[in-house]
From Swiss-Prot:
<dbReference type="GO" id="GO:0022627">
    <property type="term" value="C:cytosolic small ribosomal subunit"/>
</dbReference>
<dbReference type="InterPro" id="IPR000589">
    <property type="entry name" value="Ribosomal_uS15"/>
</dbReference>
<dbReference type="GO" id="GO:0003735">
    <property type="term" value="F:structural constituent of ribosome"/>
</dbReference>
<protein>
    <recommendedName>
        <fullName>Small ribosomal subunit protein uS15</fullName>
    </recommendedName>
</protein>
<dbReference type="Pfam" id="PF00312">
    <property type="entry name" value="Ribosomal_S15"/>
</dbReference>
<comment type="subunit">
    <text>Part of the 30S ribosomal subunit.</text>
</comment>
<dbReference type="InterPro" id="IPR023029">
    <property type="entry name" value="Ribosomal_uS15_arc_euk"/>
</dbReference>
<dbReference type="InterPro" id="IPR009068">
    <property type="entry name" value="uS15_NS1_RNA-bd_sf"/>
</dbReference>
<dbReference type="InterPro" id="IPR012606">
    <property type="entry name" value="Ribosomal_uS15_N"/>
</dbReference>
<keyword id="KW-0689">Ribosomal protein</keyword>
<keyword id="KW-0687">Ribonucleoprotein</keyword>
<dbReference type="GO" id="GO:0070181">
    <property type="term" value="F:small ribosomal subunit rRNA binding"/>
</dbReference>
<dbReference type="Pfam" id="PF08069">
    <property type="entry name" value="Ribosomal_S13_N"/>
</dbReference>
<feature type="region of interest" description="Disordered">
    <location>
        <begin position="1"/>
        <end position="21"/>
    </location>
</feature>
<feature type="compositionally biased region" description="Basic residues">
    <location>
        <begin position="1"/>
        <end position="16"/>
    </location>
</feature>
<comment type="similarity">
    <text>Belongs to the universal ribosomal protein uS15 family.</text>
</comment>
<dbReference type="GO" id="GO:0006412">
    <property type="term" value="P:translation"/>
</dbReference>
Length: 152
């Protein structure tokens, strides 16, 4: 696969080993893993970071193998509402930081171009999430409104 806004190939990465049951070294029960996921979310971690913490600190290679559910589903079952998908939220935060930079440094042409590329990714991703029903159909990218919502 190639990159969206660059003329180069992507990076190859390692593949996860196929297994249909949790490894024998995992000593936490599914209930304990769910409790740990909620605890980490309440500490302020995003779902991807929760998975990395569980992998690195607790030796759980995959939450889905242990519990049978993804982290998002565990959070949803316990009444946690995630307003924006994590990848979209990260792009919005990046765009807002770049806008703040461009307010101070108005002639920074290179970063103005970078902002255009980031916002193109946001529009592309938001149209995908609108099709899938994750975002409302009338949702629009408005940086001024999102600055307030994302900062909460």
């Amino acid at each position: 696969m190639a990159r969206i806004h660059a003329r180069r190939r992507g990076k190859s990465g390692s593949k996860r080993i196929y297994r249909d049951s949790p490894p024998e070294w995992v000593d936490m029960s599914p209930e304990e893993v769910e409790k740990k996921v909620l605890e980490l979310y309440n500490e302020g971690y995003e779902p991807s970071m929760i998975g990395m913490i569980l992998r690195d600190r607790y030796g759980i290679p995959s939450v889905k193998q242990v519990t049978g559910k993804k982290i998002q589903k565990i959070l949803k079952e316990h009444g946690v509402e995630i307003k924006y998908p994590e990848d979209l939220k990260a792009l919005i935060k990046k765009a807002l930081k770049l806008r703040a930079h461009l307010e101070v440094h108005r002639k920074d042409k290179h970063n103005r171009r970078g902002l255009q590329l980031i916002e193109a990714k946001i529009w592309r991703l938001s149209s995908y999430y609108k099709e899938k029903g994750v975002l409302p159909a009338d949702w629009k990218y408005n940086p001024d409104r999102l600055k307030i919502e994302i900062s909460k």
